[in-house]
């Protein structure tokens, strides 16, 4: 942590394909709620936004990028789980999502995950939603890609019946679909989003947790939300940091 502050630069992994949370803009820099959280943390280290190196980090490479030191932290719709805690350390959560489903607007036979039996269900390799479907809904035909955007065209052309990931991610795709897609049913899991850092860097984790508690209280967290995901989604409840 001190080395980052002294260097005045930081490398942050985030998604480049998720509207509202992490999406590459035409200007060549990512935008979204995760990106704003990353900027706040960097800023509190004394690092200007222009000295952040953003690295595209998909679900399958979040842990490898942290372990190898390719990134200093990951802010990428990254669900905290006990299994992942064995590999990386998590600060947060800074947002609580839930797994949901997205279909074509014309689909009317999928409303709960129990309806997925025999359906082609698209998700992403290395993701919590994919693991949940494989474990709890084995009669679904799971189709895995490297990124959620890779699921969109198969959904359009009928190769898959449904896309599943966190509700807020799907909301971003629906918002950009001009009525083509819809989110169906209610969230059926709890997905607390955390900030991933190196497993042994407990000092950095604790410091980020302090930053999160601070921005929950001073309004910067809510402002970051309202400027990004909050354009489409309602204001969320303030999470409680898990100082495990």
PLM feature spans:
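Short, Asp-centered acidic motifs that coordinate Mg2+ and/or phosphate
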Residues: 10-11, 72-73, 161-162, 181, ...
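Acidic, polar ligand-binding/catalytic clefts
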Residues: 39, 51-115
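A ligand-binding cleft/hinge motif common to bilobed small-molecule-binding domains
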Residues: 61, 77-86, 132-135, 156-190
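Bilobed "Venus flytrap"/periplasmic-binding protein-like clamshell domains
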Residues: 17-19, 30-45, 79, 97-152, ...
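Extended ligand-binding regions for polar small-molecule ligands
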Residues: 35, 44, 107, 127, ...
């Amino acid at each position: 942590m001190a080395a980052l502050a002294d260097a005045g630069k930081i490398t942050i992994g985030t998604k480049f394909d998720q509207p509202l949370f992490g999406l590459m803009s035409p200007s060549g820099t990512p935008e979204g709620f995760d990106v704003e959280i990353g900027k706040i943390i960097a800023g509190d280290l004394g690092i200007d936004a222009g000295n952040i190196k953003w690295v595209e980090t998909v679900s399958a490479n979040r842990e490898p990028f942290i372990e190898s030191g390719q990134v200093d932290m990951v802010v990428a719709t990254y669900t905290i789980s006990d299994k992942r805690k064995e590999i990386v350390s998590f600060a947060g959560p800074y947002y609580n999502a839930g797994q949901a489903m997205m279909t074509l607007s014309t689909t009317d036979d999928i409303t709960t995950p129990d309806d997925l039996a025999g359906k082609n269900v698209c998700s992403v390799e290395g993701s919590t939603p994919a693991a949940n479907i494989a474990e709890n809904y084995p009669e679904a035909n799971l189709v895995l890609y490297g990124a959620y955007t890779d699921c969109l065209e198969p959904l359009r052309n009928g190769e898959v019946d449904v896309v599943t990931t966190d509700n807020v991610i799907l909301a971003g795709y629906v918002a950009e679909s001009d009525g083509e897609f819809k989110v169906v049913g209610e969230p059926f899991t709890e997905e607390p989003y955390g900030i991933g850092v190196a497993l042994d860097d407990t000092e950095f984790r604790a410091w980020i947790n302090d930053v999160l508690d601070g921005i929950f209280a001073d309004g910067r967290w809510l402002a970051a939300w309202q400027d990004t995901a909050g354009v489409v989604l309602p204001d969320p409840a303030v999470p409680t940091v898990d100082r495990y």
